[in-house]
Design a protein with these regions (language model features):
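Short linear motifs in intrinsically disordered
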Residues: 11-12, 36-40
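The right-handed parallel beta-helix/beta-solenoid scaffold, focusing on the short coil/turn
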Residues: 20, 33, 45-47, 89, ...
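Soluble non-cytosolic domains of exported or imported proteins
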Residues: 2-5, 95, 138
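Extracellular beta-strand/beta-solenoid scaffold signature
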Residues: 34-37, 67-92, 115-135, 157-183, ...
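Extracellular/periplasmic catalytic domains that process cell-envelope and extracellular macromolecules
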Residues: 15-17, 40-43, 53, 136-138
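Acidic Gly/Asp/Thr-rich repetitive segments characteristic of extracellular carbohydrate-active
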Residues: 1-25, 29-31
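Right-handed parallel beta-helix/beta-spiral solenoid domain characteristic of secreted/periplasmic
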Residues: 23-30, 38-118, 151-157
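Right-handed parallel beta-helix
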Residues: 46, 50-55, 97-108, 137-153, ...
Length: 198
């Protein structure tokens, strides 16, 4: 665009194509915002989401926003294990490939609501970054580098749903005859993860 976007919701509405770059200004804090992308680059021209300028890393501060629905498609081996439900993610890469996230600060801590406890059983599931493969078979070339992910307070009981600092998962395809979801060339480098719980 000729003018910079003021919110991440404008970025979420885009279809990102090979070679596209989303540049977030250093020193900016995206309060109560999230970045949920469905982007497909190529090996020669990956999609890039990264910082520019000088100063502190751009901070995506979800604070409990960015809800999406995780569903494994069938009950798990233990009836006590939760296999579907809502998750709050500051950054969600859903069926993305050939994409690079670099030099971002990410957090997702809304604080405790009145009457809520840290270890409450029905507490919201939360991630800093969630990478989900489901309906496109093998996803290639996903790189997370130089991320500072911190203060993500998820549900300490729902171990099968997305919870924690950086969470990558393959789910059952929605189509019965869909190709099995998997990753190839998924790289997580130089990332710092602090004060995160599942």
């Amino acid at each position: 665009p000729e003018q910079p976007f003021k919110t991440l919701s404008a970025v979420n509405a885009l279809t990102l194509n090979p070679g596209d770059r989303v540049l977030l200004a250093r020193g900016c804090v995206f309060e109560n915002q999230y970045l949920h992308l469905r982007a497909r680059g190529t090996k020669e021209a990956p999609v890039a989401v990264e910082s520019y300028g000088e100063g502190a890393l751009p901070h995506i501060k979800a604070s409990g926003t960015g809800l999406w629905y995780q569903n494994y498609g069938q009950p798990l081996d233990n009836p006590n294990h939760v296999w579907h439900g809502y998750v709050s993610s500051a950054v969600l890469l859903y069926d993305c490939e050939y994409i690079r996230l670099r030099d971002l600060e990410i957090s997702n801590d809304p604080g405790l609501l009145p009457g809520e406890r840290y270890n409450q059983g029905d507490k919201m599931n939360r991630t800093g970054v969630a990478v989900v493969a489901q309906n496109r078979g093998t996803l290639h070339g996903i790189t997370l580098t130089g991320l500072y992910v911190h203060d993500v307070k998820g549900n300490v009981y729902d171990k099968h749903l997305a919870n924690g600092g950086i969470y990558c998962v393959c789910q059952k395809p929605e189509q019965e005859n869909g190709e099995i979801a998997r990753y190839e060339d998924l790289h997580i480098t130089r990332c710092r993860v602090e004060r995160c719980s599942r």
